[in-house]
């Protein structure tokens, strides 16, 4: 937009500083800037504008676009610093993390080095607003990956558009490029909006769902000569202020619950567009750029550090929090975070002057393209090769704690009924007696359910995290978006004369291996329907995964109750996670925070479902939730393979954290049958996470491994026989 020989705009660098500051404040947990993630959207628009302007100027001055030279410049500009941060994070993070977390970090690094990090995190359906730096030290590479994908594809679009009408003149070439860009922007924006409305998991990281933001910047660069006429000395300052205000309003008013990107992304994107259009000093008569707010004083210089600061700040925060936790430094989370932010800014300044600029401006690299591509290949492949070597070296040093256990060795040798009727006060748990129950024969364990018992050494390669009940996956497990009831989910003895209905969320799912074996042994049919994060209740909940009220859970519960009207069974077993008390919402979809409101909402919802099921099936048994570990058990065991007791935790307190829900249920229905298997999950206090036979109990903080669940089959044989089939 400038007619001068220099195309540098200090206001854009100043805007870069504002953008990175918003991102850093958001990542630092400053609640006032809950929408600070829009800073990335500002970067996207700026990138599209600058890159397109660069390509157009080259074509207008030389009559061609040298793609080889373009990609060589991108390599010099982006890869050296990105690789430096990647390598530093791998070394320090690998030292601080558990072996299991280290494996995940190396995988993240491979994707980041190849600029596919957004696909990696999108495939994991990660929620950007729900991930903290300690969970993924390289999550921030998602945006760099999308930008690099744009940098690879966009020059090709420009070249093809210009080549297609090369004989028709510059005006038609520009018109065609403008038309093609508008089509891409419209299509990409439509995808982004559809993803936001449908809450498609992982869509935050979608490449095509983000290209429209860079496309808007490209449109501004293509239409720059025409847009200059919109400027006047009187409208520049107020319109730039409005654009900046739009960005800041989004940063302070958006949050984790904002469907993004979609319509909401228009605010920061259009705000950035206004700054780009009206911030340009297009004529000598316009006021000097020095009075522009974004070009004031140190802002442009700080903005030139934005790329380096963005790269350093996220892993710095994560490493600081990990170190504070590992060595118990006694620093508050806020202190550790802001210390890391300060350090990351220092690293940004140093690396900008010692790595980024020297390599970008190196005469030897700019004189020939070949060294640039050799450098780029080396920087991109180093983390990939290094990761493989690191994992290979780590696997050779794995320590075995115990041989894989035979399931019969870990099954309780004696089990006493612990189903209890609860009135207005919770009845005491029955102490185990000497009622003998034979452990299931090994032949009862299906090979699809259990290949072998997990041992602590498996924690180092995520075998524990993947030890899920295979028989409960697939069509019989409804995901977050599902509302239909799956047919024919039959476990246990399919021809059994007695039938138990087992329903609930993933905390029912982790009991299904035990129920399946108990059903086979005792001649019970077990009909099961499960939906992730969705308890069987008439109360409405918030979905952390979908970042909105969980309407699909409401609909699924309604469909489930309707489907059960045509089912014949001897009773219903319900299991659910205790943390649902943190997710109840009112009629307006607002999360309930007061215990009284939580209890009332849960009581009303439970009474509605309990009454319907009791009237239909007679006996309804609600399982108490199993203890929740204060740490990820698989991670802990991977760090302490020879000292597994370090991963135990006090069962009392954790085991009864569902008290609010349970007491509300009792008050709602007067009397409730409940079943508690905590004494068999935690035979001692602290609750140990590895059995005497070497079977790991938990695969994360709350879910039992499929292997350990099978060892509970004798327990369920006794408890369910007493609950559903014994007459008094």
Go through the PLM ranges and name each one.
Residues 1-390, 726:
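Membrane-interface helix/loop caps of multi-pass membrane proteins
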Residues 256, 324-338, 345-353, 357-728:
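Extracellular/periplasmic envelope-modification machinery, especially enzymes
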């Amino acid at each position: 937009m400038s007619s001068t020989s220099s195309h540098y705009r200090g206001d854009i660098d100043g805007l870069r500083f504002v953008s990175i500051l918003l991102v850093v404040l958001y990542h630092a947990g400053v609640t006032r800037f809950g929408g600070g993630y829009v800073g990335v959207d500002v970067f996207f628009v700026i990138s599209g504008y600058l890159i397109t302007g660069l390509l157009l100027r080259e074509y207008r001055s030389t009559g061609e676009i040298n793609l080889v030279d373009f990609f060589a410049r991108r390599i010099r500009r982006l890869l050296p610093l990105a690789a430096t941060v990647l390598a530093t994070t791998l070394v320090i993070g690998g030292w601080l993390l558990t072996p299991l977390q280290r494996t995940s970090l190396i995988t993240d690094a491979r994707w980041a080095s190849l600029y596919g990090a957004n696909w990696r995190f999108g495939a994991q359906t990660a929620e950007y607003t729900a991930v903290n730096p300690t969970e993924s030290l390289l999550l921030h590479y998602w945006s760099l990956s999308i930008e690099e994908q744009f940098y690879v594809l966009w020059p090709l679009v420009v070249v093809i558009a210009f080549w297609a009408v090369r004989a028709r003149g510059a005006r038609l070439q520009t018109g065609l490029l403008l038309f093609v860009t508008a089509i891409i922007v419209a299509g990409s924006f439509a995808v982004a909006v559809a993803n936001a409305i449908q809450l498609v998991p992982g869509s935050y990281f979608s490449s095509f769902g983000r290209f429209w933001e860079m496309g808007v910047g490209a449109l501004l660069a293509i239409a720059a000569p025409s847009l200059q006429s919109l400027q006047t000395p009187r409208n520049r300052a107020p319109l730039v202020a409005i654009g900046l205000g739009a960005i800041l309003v989004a940063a302070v008013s958006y949050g984790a619950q904002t469907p993004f990107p979609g319509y909401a992304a228009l605010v920061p994107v259009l705000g950035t567009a206004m700054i780009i259009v009206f911030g340009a000093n297009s004529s000598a008569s316009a006021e000097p750029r020095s009075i522009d707010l974004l070009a004031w004083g140190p802002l442009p210089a700080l903005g030139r550090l934005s790329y380096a600061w963005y790269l350093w700040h996220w892993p710095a925060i994560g490493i600081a929090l990990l170190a504070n936790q590992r060595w118990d430094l006694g620093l508050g989370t806020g202190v550790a975070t802001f210390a890391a932010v300060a350090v990351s800014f220092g690293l940004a300044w140093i690396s900008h002057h010692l790595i980024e600029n020297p390599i970008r401006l190196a005469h030897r690299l700019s004189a020939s393209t070949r060294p640039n591509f050799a450098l780029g290949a080396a920087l991109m492949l180093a983390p990939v090769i290094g990761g493989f070597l690191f994992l290979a070296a780590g696997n050779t040093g794995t320590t075995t704690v115990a041989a894989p256990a035979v399931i019969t060795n870990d099954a309780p040798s004696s089990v006493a009924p612990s189903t209890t009727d609860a009135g207005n006060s919770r009845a005491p748990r029955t102490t185990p007696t000497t009622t003998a129950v034979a452990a299931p024969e090994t032949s009862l364990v299906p090979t699809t359910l259990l290949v072998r018992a997990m041992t602590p050494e498996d924690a180092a390669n995520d075998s524990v995290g993947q030890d899920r009940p295979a028989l409960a996956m697939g069509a019989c497990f409804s995901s977050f978006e599902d509302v239909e009831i799956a047919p024919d989910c039959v476990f246990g003895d399919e021809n059994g004369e007695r039938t138990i209905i087992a329903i609930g969320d993933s905390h029912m799912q982790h009991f299904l291996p035990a129920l399946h074996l108990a059903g086979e042994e005792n001649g019970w049919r077990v009909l099961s329907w499960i939906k992730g994060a969705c308890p069987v209740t008439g109360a409405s909940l918030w979905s952390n995964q979908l970042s909105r009220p969980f309407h699909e859970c409401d609909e699924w519960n309604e469909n489930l109750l309707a489907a059960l009207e045509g089912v014949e069974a001897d009773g219903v077993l319900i299991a659910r996670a205790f943390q649902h008390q943190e997710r109840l919402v009112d009629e307006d979809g607002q999360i309930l925070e007061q215990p009284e409101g939580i209890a009332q909402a849960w009581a009303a919802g439970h009474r509605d479902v309990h009454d319907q099921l009791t009237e239909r099936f007679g006996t309804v048994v609600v399982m108490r939730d199993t203890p929740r570990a204060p740490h990820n058990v698989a991670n802990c065991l991977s760090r302490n393979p020879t000292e597994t007791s370090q991963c135990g935790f006090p069962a009392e307190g954790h085991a009864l954290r569902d008290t609010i829900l349970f007491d509300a249920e009792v008050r709602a229905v007067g009397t409730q049958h409940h079943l508690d298997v905590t004494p068999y999950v935690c035979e001692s206090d602290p609750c140990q996470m590895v059995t005497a036979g070497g079977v790991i109990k938990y695969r994360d903080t709350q879910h039992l491994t499929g292997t350990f669940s099978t060892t509970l089959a004798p327990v369920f044989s006794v408890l369910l026989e007493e609950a559903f089939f014994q007459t008094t």
